[in-house]
Amino acid sequence: MKVILLEPLENLGDVGQVVDVKPGYARNYLLPRGLAVLATESNLKALEARIRAQAKRLAERKAEAERLKKILENLTLTIPVRAGETKIYGSVTAKDIAEALSRQHGVTIDPKRLALEKPIKELGEYVLTYKPHPEVPIQLKVSVVAQE
């Protein structure tokens, strides 16, 4: 029996693959759990349409990431914080950086995609990587300065 996988399964394949399985396995395990659908002509057409739509969305996201890269790589984000000699009071997190970028330059980013291993706790210049798309990493320059 041919089925279209809706979830990646270790022994069968990835999402969207058409695989041939035993009828009992399909009827008793894959279909009731929503892991696969029968490979009918209408389901195959729906799968093709979904694949085309997903490819279009990925291309749009990549184009948006390229546009964002042109904007972000040419600027340095300055974040003023309360500080002593070199240490700051508190820390600067990815969320703080995203808010400052939105406030100062009107650019909105997802803080979860900003590679910041631990919060910034000292004054200085930092180069962070932002990944809005897996193929488009962006180097963002951040300057943490003492508030006057």
Swiss-Prot record:
InterPro entries: Ribosomal_bL9, Ribosomal_bL9/RNase_H1_N, Ribosomal_bL9_bac/chp, Ribosomal_bL9_C, Ribosomal_bL9_C_sf, Ribosomal_bL9_N, Ribosomal_bL9_N_sf. Disulfide bonds: none annotated. GO terms for molecular function: rRNA binding; structural constituent of ribosome. Pfam families: Ribosomal_L9_C, Ribosomal_L9_N. GO terms for biological process: translation. Keywords: Ribonucleoprotein, Ribosomal protein, RNA-binding, rRNA-binding. GO terms for cellular component: ribonucleoprotein complex; ribosome. Transmembrane segments: none annotated. It comes from the Bacteria. Binds to the 23S rRNA. Belongs to the bacterial ribosomal protein bL9 family. This is Large ribosomal subunit protein bL9. It comes from Thermus thermophilus. The gene is rplI.
